[in-house]
Amino acid sequence: MALTIYQHSSSLTSHLQTVHQTQVQFRKFVGITKVWDAQVRDKKLLALAHTEIIVRLSDPSAIPKLESVRIASGHINHPSVTFVTDPEKCPLCTNPSVSSSKSLSDLPTSGVVLKLRDLNLKSPLQMNDVILETGVTGLDIEAHILGRHYPHLAIILLGGVEHLVNIQTTTLTQHYQDLTLNLFGTTYKAGYLNSLRTISSEQEQPVYNGPGIRTLVPNGHVIIPNTPPPAQINQAASQGVITYQQSRDDNEDPFTTHHFRPDDGSDFPQSEHTNVPALVLSPSPSAMPPVESSNTRDQQTNAASAFTPIEPESRVADWSEDFDSAQMDQNLTPPQPPAPASTPEDTDSTARQPQVTPTRVPNTVTATSASTPASTSQIQFGDRSPVTMTQHTLRAPPPPPQPTNRNITPDFLRPRPTDVPSSNFNHLAILRNPTDQALTDRLNALAGLVNAGVLDPQECREILQTLKN
């Protein structure tokens, strides 16, 4: 029985071939979920990823042999059992009574967990004939996840299973505050891990009981807040379409849909493997760079070129100088309809009301100043004498002239005295060190520090007072 591991560590491949001849393959990455250090050494969120490990056992009796597998380089370390699969979904599982077992000796035909380290997953791998569902509690890999390279990830792989036993609950239920992760140049804030529990029935609905990660969906995957409902996730997963948060490059859509199908052309087995929730994480608003595609930039450029630039205010003021208000009034005044024949009653009221001729006032600020260009217009009220009004255009005063003294030298370009020490040293040391030179040298150095901007005058006075005392 040959062991098939695609583009993995050669030492791991050769060692597994000699130990138990088990065929191990890794399925494609099918989404993004919470990832943290299984050992909680530094209590730090290391990476986001999600995948499934698929073990094909040609010889079920090889499972107990995994207990003795130890590789000096640390590729496989402390394998332990985390769950067993449903016998109906696993042709190799023949004993349903071991569904709650926790030791390798009780599971001659069920899944095991390996802690794999320093693997190198560089390409998606196709599935094999018989799938024995299994999971991994800790996996440190140098992986190419969806075409991106991330070294030294610590990944929690919960597999596509229904029954979960002996997961490192004490480790996974640590309360972390303000976990953040920088992925694809975007910072994600995941809150803290509040609770982790197993669900043994697909009919049981997830229970959200606090911020951060809330619970496990029936197939053992972690749900993060602000994700689609589980039914919607499962429907998308069953169709092999997973939407996840990806890069935020200018030329790349941040939300990308990927279709995951076996490379050999076969269909996904109708098991829990097809019921994998995709977790779409919302990055922090403060760390979200604006996404601007090339099409958006072209549209903005075309839209900007369709407008005529607005003339500056000075052009408007100059235009108002030779503006003929009378001619403008004549051109803009609409023709008046003929007035109806007035009756004797209307004559008196018409004489009492002033006749106002509408005039167009330019859109400029008006003020009574004799020093500015002016234009005159006349307004007549009834039979009274015309009133001449003068319109002045108010101009803003010119800006004050900027100082043109070219002899001003910036502080950082001024030459320093030769006895001024560097600004990086502890300036109090030269005053307190008894092996220093005379007091005059210390004062010269102190003055140099003040001139260089290292000390302010108040600090200088305090130091001088200390020296005096």
Swiss-Prot record:
It comes from the Viruses. Residues 292-305, 350-365 have a biased composition (Polar residues). Residues 248-314, 327-418 are annotated as: Disordered. Residues 366-377 have a biased composition (Low complexity). This is Uncharacterized protein VP7. It comes from Cryphonectria parasitica mycoreovirus 1 (strain 9B21) (CpMYRV-1). The gene is S7.
